[in-house]
């Protein structure tokens, strides 16, 4: 979340407080959702554009009102290799699958089967403006789809970037059949991000994404990754997530990498750390089974 967007939220919050009672709360929450989420309807690029085989997947989810069904769009990118690990890819607060293609392709290059989803309101998924609870529900539904496609728990992993890291930690604290969770460029909570510049407006945040609390109760090994040159999410937040997470866990700071690591800093070490983590997590599941 950029400083400009935080500023817009602060102005919106103060304006909303002028409205009294429930109406004011409703205005504040809706304005917050409008400023926080930046859904993009980007259909232009697909994995085929970078030479990767893929399948369009549609996942049913309950509507926000609970009286109907909506669909979440996903890509399934098979590695074509027997015994390859599978990862659920959860993107950040902006863009859509097409705009995340370069990062999704990295996982395929590492040899993973990849299930990457667009939350409701993003890309080709149904819905307009998502909410925190909807995004969590979308991730859980996508996890069920991954489990259906990959029956072996030692091969199933969860990955999230930025906002997606918070979603990954929530999912990793909920399901008990993931081999590991990888959280990249994660924040401790949206409220903490707001407090960085506009405290005490953090008390008004309804879309909290309290990743710190979810990290405390993770049910799987965790790898936390953060770039030291991240200007959007302080690297210290990943250090805090790491500090509260139960063992086994690992923290890897990428020297010189920005929030999206567009500059490709430390990619060799990035790949090595991920593959070592995955190998260790898989072995741990096997050992647990005896």
Report residues per predicted region:
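An N-terminal hydrophobic leader/cap segment in hydrolases
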Residues: 20-63
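Membrane-embedded segments
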Residues: 66-145, 149, 172
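Short alpha-helix in the alpha/beta-hydrolase fold that links the catalytic acid
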Residues: 103, 220, 234-243
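Alpha/beta-hydrolase fold nucleophile elbow
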Residues: 150-162
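Hydrolase active-site cap/lid region
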Residues: 165-220, 268
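Short beta-strand/loop motif that positions the catalytic acidic residue
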Residues: 217-219, 224-226, 230
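Acidic catalytic loop of the alpha/beta-hydrolase fold
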Residues: 228-233, 259-261
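Catalytic histidine-centered segment of alpha/beta-hydrolase-like enzymes
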Residues: 257-267
């Amino acid at each position: 979340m950029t400083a400009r967007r935080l500023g817009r939220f602060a102005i919106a919050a103060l304006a909303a407080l002028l409205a009294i009672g429930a109406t004011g709360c409703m205005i504040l929450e809706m304005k917050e959702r409008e400023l926080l989420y930046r859904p993009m309807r980007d259909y232009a690029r697909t994995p085929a554009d970078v030479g990767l085989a893929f399948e369009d997947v549609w996942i049913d989810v309950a509507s926000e009102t609970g009286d109907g069904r909506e669909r979440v769009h996903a890509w399934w990118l098979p590695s074509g290799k027997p015994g390859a690990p599978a990862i659920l890819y959860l993107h950040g607060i902006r863009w859509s699958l097409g705009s995340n293609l370069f990062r999704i392709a990295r996982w395929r290059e590492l040899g993973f089967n990849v299930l990457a989803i667009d939350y409701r309101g993003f890309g080709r998924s149904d819905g307009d403006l998502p909410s925190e609870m909807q995004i969590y529900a979308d991730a859980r539904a996508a996890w069920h789809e991954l489990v259906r496609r990959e029956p072996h728990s030692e091969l199933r992993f969860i990955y999230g970037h930025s906002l997606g890291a918070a979603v990954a930690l929530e999912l990793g604290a909920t399901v008990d059949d993931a081999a590991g969770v990888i959280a990249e460029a994660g924040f401790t909570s949206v409220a903490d991000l707001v407090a960085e510049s506009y405290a005490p407006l953090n008390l008004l945040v309804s879309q909290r994404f309290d990743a710190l609390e979810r990290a405390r109760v993770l049910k799987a090994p965790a790898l936390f990754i953060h770039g030291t040159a991240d200007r959007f999410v302080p690297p210290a937040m990943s250090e805090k997530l790491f500090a509260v997470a139960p063992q086994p866990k690992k923290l890897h700071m990428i020297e010189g990498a920005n929030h999206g690591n567009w500059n490709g800093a430390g990619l060799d070490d990035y790949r090595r750390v991920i593959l070592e983590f995955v190998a260790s997590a898989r072995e741990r599941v096997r050992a647990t089974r005896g």
